[in-house]
């Protein structure tokens, strides 16, 4: 039996890999405008695997780490994380936070974490992670 997540994983990876600039324009037009596309971009799949391989944070679907340059000349890394699911997942905001922090901690580069939630719920749209001690 085929895992439903696997069915969605490969096409999303191919779309991002082959059409990254168009993908960013469609899903993240404001971010797209800030990128200097004339300088190109570089997928950092090996760097991402170094950071997340030991994470015990639940399922990972399509994750891409891409080095781009802002129009200001600043190098930034963009973490694109795509969740394909039909229900809420409580660990998603935490996982995004952990990936962002681990990338920054290991490589000392600013990271923009972007998510495409491809589930059918219009009410579940996590936009932050936090916790309180007191």
Question: Where would I find each of the regions flagged by the language model?
Answer:
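Accessory alpha/beta interaction modules
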Residues: 1-134
């Amino acid at each position: 039996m085929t895992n439903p997540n696997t069915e969605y994983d490969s096409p999303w990876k191919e779309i991002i890999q082959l059409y990254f600039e168009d993908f960013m324009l469609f899903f993240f037009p404001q971010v797209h405008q800030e990128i200097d596309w004339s300088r190109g971009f570089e997928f950092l799949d090996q760097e991402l695997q170094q950071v997340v391989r030991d994470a015990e944070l639940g399922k990972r679907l399509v994750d891409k780490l891409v080095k781009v340059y802002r129009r200001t000349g600043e190098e930034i890394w963009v973490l694109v994380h795509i969740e394909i699911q039909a229900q809420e997942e409580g660990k998603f905001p935490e996982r995004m936070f952990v990936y962002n922090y681990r990338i920054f901690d290991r490589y000392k580069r600013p990271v923009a974490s972007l998510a495409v939630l491809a589930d059918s719920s219009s009410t579940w749209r996590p936009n932050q992670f936090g916790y309180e001690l007191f």
